[in-house]
């Protein structure tokens, strides 16, 4: 989910970088069996884990008749046990609706892409104050932290890989959003209906389904006109999954007309460049320049015109905090002046947006979602509807971004007046859709990366992108 660039964002001098080097993967992606999606007995074992050779002990002491009877009994016993192999325990359904806790029996979720750090001489100087400030974050990177993140990432992978198979011209945006959100809630095993349940696990923010020149922050809203996917559309799918507030934010773009292939290739390459350059002590301005250099080396031919792919200037990648999709650091896609560095323990959403238009996104009409200030107080609110709505928001979403669709799913009614009051008081912030000029096309790719002490883990990486 893109973070809008602040008004004082400035462009700066060039910094040399090498964005085209490949990422050295320490451990390649696991197959389904390796990641716990398939379960069965090991070779030479029964379903109960018994070794078949153990039954042979003492066989030479038996008579021939006893051996025959024993063999028949063992064959009969094995035949009955083989029936267990036909059960679907440990397998995912299509569409994915089995909670991951029922698939990964030991509740240990697979690692994502592990990448070793590349040491740069100019990055050896550490800043003691920043180390101290982030010490608590690093200490939180324990087994529970990693397992929560890996579970959220596995949910994201399974849901999106199914959704990609049904995303075709003619499908409604509301159906896609429903499939994604139903899948996430089923796999996390938290439907989010009971008070506070959505804070345990589920959607981290409303599903973003942005077409063509809509760059970010659009989702189907109740009562709005239905939008149907067309063959010539460029669709960006951006959704987040959280487990105990640990948010995985990842996005991809789909297009059916091959004329947009170079646009998608440019943006995907730029995102991978950002992931390669990311690391402990990495300078954010260097990462930004590397991203822009790669993205703007591409062109796309539309209507017999060669159009350069441009990096969007006023939306950025961002760090992620617990229960907060946008932290206090930003990663632009263009050259910039900043002294900020990435630090050990940081979690970043490395995303890039490329456009065939002016590459500057403006607010459009409508509302994508809402975000509640964690320090918000009901003091000063005069409308009872606003007070009641604020309590519902805090109890069910906290600081997670939510949409009108989520409120109505909870059974909240007649909330418009109360919401206007909360927004006007600055207690709740609204997000508008962000658009480039009409007739242009915007693409997006995004991954979440954990900057662990000894390596970085591209937690949302999958076989699809």
From Swiss-Prot:
Alphabetized GO MF terms: initiator methionyl aminopeptidase activity; metal ion binding; metalloaminopeptidase activity
Sequence positions that bind substrate: 217, 326
Cofactor detail note: Binds 2 divalent metal cations per subunit. Has a high-affinity and a low affinity metal-binding site. The true nature of the physiological cofactor is under debate. The enzyme is active with cobalt, zinc, manganese or divalent iron ions. Most likely, methionine aminopeptidases function as mononuclear Fe(2+)-metalloproteases under physiological conditions, and the catalytically relevant metal-binding site has been assigned to the histidine-containing high-affinity site.
GO biological process, one term: proteolysis
Gene3D superfamilies associated with the record: Creatinase/methionine aminopeptidase superfamily, Winged helix-like DNA-binding domain superfamily/Winged helix DNA-binding domain
Keyword Transmembrane helix found: no
Matches recorded under PROSITE patterns: MAP_2
A Pfam family assignment: Peptidase_M24
Residues that coordinate or bind a divalent metal cation 1: 238, 249, 446
Localization, UniProt: Cytoplasm
Keywords: Aminopeptidase, Cytoplasm, Hydrolase, Metal-binding, Protease
Biased composition (Basic and acidic residues): 1-13
EC number: 3.4.11.18
Keyword Ribonucleoprotein belongs to the record: no
GO cellular component, one term: cytoplasm
Catalytic activity: Release of N-terminal amino acids, preferentially methionine, from peptides and arylamides
Cofactor: Co(2+); Zn(2+); Mn(2+); Fe(2+)
Disulphide-bridged cysteine pairs: none
Bias (Acidic residues): 44-55
Chain residues that bind a divalent metal cation 2: 249, 318, 351, 446
InterPro entries recorded: Creatinase/aminopeptidase-like, Met_Aminopeptidase_Type2, Pept_M24, Pept_M24_MAP, Pept_M24A_MAP2, Pept_M24A_MAP2_BS, WH-like_DNA-bd_sf, WH_DNA-bd_sf
NCBIfam families in alphabetical order: met_pdase_II
Family: Belongs to the peptidase M24A family. Methionine aminopeptidase eukaryotic type 2 subfamily.
Function: Cotranslationally removes the N-terminal methionine from nascent proteins. The N-terminal methionine is often cleaved when the second residue in the primary sequence is small and uncharged (Met-Ala-, Cys, Gly, Pro, Ser, Thr, or Val).
This protein's name: Methionine aminopeptidase 2-2
């Amino acid at each position: 989910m893109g973070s809008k660039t602040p008004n004082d964002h400035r462009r700066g001098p060039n910094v040399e970088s090498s964005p085209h080097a490949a990422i050295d993967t320490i451990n390649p992606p696991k197959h389904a069996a390796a990641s716990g999606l398939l379960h069965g007995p090991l070779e030479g074992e029964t379903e109960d884990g018994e070794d078949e050779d153990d039954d042979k002990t003492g066989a030479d002491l038996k008579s021939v008749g006893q051996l025959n009877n024993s063999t028949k009994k063992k064959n009969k016993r094995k035949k009955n046990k083989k029936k267990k192999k036909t059960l679907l325990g440990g397998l995912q359904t299509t569409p994915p609706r089995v909670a991951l806790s029922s698939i990964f029996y030991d509740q240990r979720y697979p690692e994502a892409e592990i990448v070793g750090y590349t040491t740069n001489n100019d990055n050896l100087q550490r800043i003691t104050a920043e180390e101290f400030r982030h010490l608590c974050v690093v200490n939180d990177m324990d087994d529970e932290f990693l397992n929560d993140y890996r579970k959220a990432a596995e949910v994201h992978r399974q849901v999106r890989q199914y959704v990609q198979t049904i995303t075709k011209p003619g499908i409604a945006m509301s159906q896609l959003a429903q499939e994604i959100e139903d899948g996430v809630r089923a796999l996390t095993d938290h439907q989010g209906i009971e008070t506070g349940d959505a804070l345990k696990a589920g959607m981290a923010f409303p599903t973003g389904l942005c077409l063509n020149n809509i760059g970010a922050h659009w989702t189907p809203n109740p009562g709005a006109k239905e939008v149907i996917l067309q063959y010539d559309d460029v669709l960006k799918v951006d959704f987040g999954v959280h487990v105990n507030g640990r948010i995985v934010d990842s996005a991809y773009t789909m297009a059916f007309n091959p004329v947009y292939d170079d646009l998608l290739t440019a943006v995907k390459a730029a995102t991978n460049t950002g992931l390669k350059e990311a690391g402990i002590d990495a300078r954010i301005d260097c990462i930004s320049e590397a991203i822009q250099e790669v993205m703007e080396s591409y062109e796309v031919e539309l209507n017999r015109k060669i159009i350069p792919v441009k990096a969007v200037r006023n939306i950025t990648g961002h760090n992620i905090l617990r229960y907060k999709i946008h932290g206090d650091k930003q990663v632009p896609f263009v050259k910039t002046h900043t002294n900020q560095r990435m630090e050990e323990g940081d979690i970043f959403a490395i995303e890039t947006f490329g456009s065939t238009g002016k590459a500057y996104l403006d607010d459009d009409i409508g509302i994508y979602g809402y975000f509640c200030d964690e320090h918000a107080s009901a003091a000063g609110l005069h409308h009872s509807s606003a007070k009641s709505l604020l309590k519902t928001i805090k109890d069910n979403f906290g600081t997670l971004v939510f949409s009108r669709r989520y409120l109505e799913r909870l059974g909240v009614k007649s909330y418009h007046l109360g919401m206007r009051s909360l927004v006007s008081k600055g207690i709740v912030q609204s997000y508008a859709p962000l658009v480039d000029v009409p007739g242009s096309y915007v693409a997006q790719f995004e991954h979440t990366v954990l900057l662990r002490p000894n390596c970085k883990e591209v937690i949302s990486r999958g076989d699809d992108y």
